[in-house]
């Protein structure tokens, strides 16, 4: 166990944030990379050394105000940030995480998305594809309504993509909650007489979470 301690404003949180950056590709608190770059500078550099049971790793990251971040592991450029999750797994708990209980469902979704992405790298890819399709659909809906229309064949195409990716996302989340229930429930029983039960309640009331049911729901609720 490692404990990092020091006076206020000495950079303790910065160290943890830097480690988290190499696990998830982004900060746990900043909305954009620009917020992580020192005032007056155009870029910032991070580096980390770690190892597993098989080999040692050295990772580097450069953040630029006007461009994408550049990441490499052992000298090999990483094109997709989701790849980082296969090297370094990190779980961060901060005071803000109390929002998991007190906050809105979006807080809990962000926690689940971050955790599931580390367990199943394909989940991150699926989630990214889903969000891109959702943006395209919303843009098309805005255009159609401006023209006084309410349906278009292209909408069904985007609904098909959303249904395909969305059904997979819900399955991943459901599996994660079941796994979390198994382990967290046992820990809760050791420290308390209370029973901990977590339930996954998606906004789409779809019992089988099938792609077909998801598509029908989207077609009916444009």
Predicted regions and their residues:
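Conserved NTPase motor "head" modules and their coupling/switch loops across ABC/AAA+ ATPases, GTPases
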Residues: 1-7, 20-21, 31, 149-222
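Nucleotide-state sensing region of NTPase/ATPase domains
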Residues: 23-107, 113-119, 123, 181, ...
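Conserved lysine of the Walker
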Residues: 11-12
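Long, charged N-terminal accessory/stalk domains
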Residues: 99-100, 106-149, 153-156, 160
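Intracellular alpha-helical coupling/juxtamembrane segments of multi-pass membrane proteins
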Residues: 36-39, 130-133, 173
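Short amphipathic alpha-helical segments enriched in hydrophobics
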Residues: 19, 23-26, 141
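Short, charged low-complexity intrinsically disordered segments located at boundaries
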Residues: 46-52, 119, 139-146, 162-173, ...
